[in-house]
């Protein structure tokens, strides 16, 4: 994890590529270990601004500085630090105190650079920007778009239930099934057979908005 964070922060490598490489390192890791490693790296990257401020370190980050950032993450997540030399002088109470102090300020609380906070306020105003920014830090739900050419929402829901993947309907999104808990749906036969795709709910409404008719040619660009 430390090597991965150094590659991302110091070398500018893409987090997803670094995580994929890290997960290949030890074939003995089970799904729980792999999930822990991936989520730890992504969390520390996402909350870098806040954690760096609490750890009182500056770029470029050597190994000791990365360990300090990692210690901040561990303390704030409620983990008991092991008896390693890297954690010998970790100021647990100070870390918690700095967290309470810094999270009174929006740019630290949401862990974004000054320029982004200033731009958001300028474009949207204080109230809307604060609300929108907080929403960006909520983990998005996994939402499926049912392929009604091949199945129905009810049939797909039952198929997934047999795999212990629970979903729910939403009145505003006629083609959507929303997972109640995150799961790797790409491994299912239903996905391989084209019964659904993963797509956020708002994007699913675009097809209805366009009111496409048979015989029309549609260009889907991004």
Language-model region placement:
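Class I SAM-dependent methyltransferase Rossmann-like catalytic core
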Residues: 106, 189-197
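Conserved class I S-adenosyl-L-methionine
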Residues: 215-222
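Glycine-rich helix-loop-beta junction characteristic of Rossmann-like nucleotide cofactor-binding loops
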Residues: 188-189, 208-214
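Conserved hydrophobic/aromatic pocket- or pore-lining residues that grip, position, or stack substrates
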Residues: 120, 144, 198, 206, ...
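Class I Rossmann-like S-adenosyl-L-methionine
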Residues: 1-187
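Glycine-centered loop/turn positions within well-structured domains
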Residues: 142, 204, 216
